[in-house]
């Protein structure tokens, strides 16, 4: 952000750094993070352009996302690795497009939501270019916003999760019923269903786990 004249001219930056009472009472590693932020703000003269709220309540989070949407903003997740990315889904459900690390959960989310860009966050130029690109096309931003809202409901809601789970249970039971009716006996080893070929003398060598 500090190296992009385009971003500094057209955007403000809000850093969500958790909740704190007093920076002086944080542990040394946390203090180092804030010190680095202060130095970057000073180096690129970002005074008046960067905010880092002291506290927020869980109930405030949807309102923060929607406020960013009303401003035509982005949700940026520059973590080096992200196993899933619940915050990305929260942002998408509110219609806030993303720029995120090209790793793990964000890949799955983007493949289903198509609501932003992924980039190599270890390459600062690549991250800067992704942010500039995402902010420069308003029609694309609107499409990403709609895509996120629709896709989260379709792919990641609790109703959809339960529906898929019940469908998988039904499909597994259907497989078992068909195998049982065909004469193949069923057993349970270590809590998992196994298939046993009744015509084989070597039982241990003729078991298949059901996928």
Task: Identify the residue ranges that each predicted region occupies.
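Conserved acidic donor-binding segment of nucleotide-sugar-dependent glycosyltransferases
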Residues: 112-113, 117-124, 134-138
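Nucleotide-activated donor-binding/catalytic signature segment of Leloir-type glycosyltransferases, i.e.
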Residues: 17-21, 25-69, 73
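Short hydrophobic faces within alpha-helices
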Residues: 1, 90-92
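Short hydrophobic beta-strand element within catalytic cores of glycosyltransferases
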Residues: 74, 97-100
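Short glycine/serine-rich donor-binding loops of glycosyltransferases
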Residues: 85-88, 106
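C-terminal amphipathic helix plus adjacent low-complexity
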Residues: 18-21, 140-142, 147-211
